[in-house]
Amino acid sequence: MDGTLLDLNYDNHVWNHALPAAYAQEHSINLEDARSALITHMQEIHGTIDFYSFNYWTAYTKLDIVELHRGYTELIEFRPGAKAFLNWAKRSNKTTIIATNAHPDSIKIKDEVSNISSLVDHVVSSHQYACPKENSSFWQNLKEDYDIDEKKSIFIDDNAPVLDSSKNFGIAYNLIVSRPDSQKPKKTDLPYPAFDHYADICEYLNDGISE
């Protein structure tokens, strides 16, 4: 969802700028020390469910992570062509599932702004399974709960390790977003077929969408 259907600029701004500033103020330290401490801890728990958990970060930082996110909701936007793509998928009777590492509170905030849940069939948070998408157990649980035929499924993400997990599980078609954050340049030399605007994958899907 984040960096795939929605602009990652929102999340990056909150976690990389707003959180360090609030953490520095709460703990009476300078901004660079706050940023360094947070980055170090993020690296330590990266790839775990705690990394994505609002509850975990609220306890760790002593800050209200939900309210922090609510302060920047004007940055929540669809990525180029994403909304049109979801509408096309619905018209084409294709089953769509948002499989996300986002915490349920994060999903709620973004859905209040974008109404993204109305555009798909299911929204599944990895927190339901207590393991992130990087873990093969996530995919096994998803398959069992939603009767996924991995040989006929396409998975889109902005995270290469997550795509590795999807591929290893057997998802046949894996695509990576080349510019998940609208405020940063496109990524190059990516390990999976890459695209920016959703119209770019029309040919890949052997069909078409329009904005």
Report each predicted region and the residues it spans.
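Short, intrinsically disordered/low-complexity patches at protein termini
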Residues: 29-31, 56-59, 90-93, 121, ...
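Substrate-recognition element of Asp-dependent hydrolases with the DxDx(T/V) motif
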Residues: 63-77, 82-114, 120-126
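Small/polar loops that bind or transfer phosphate-bearing groups
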Residues: 7, 98-99, 157-158
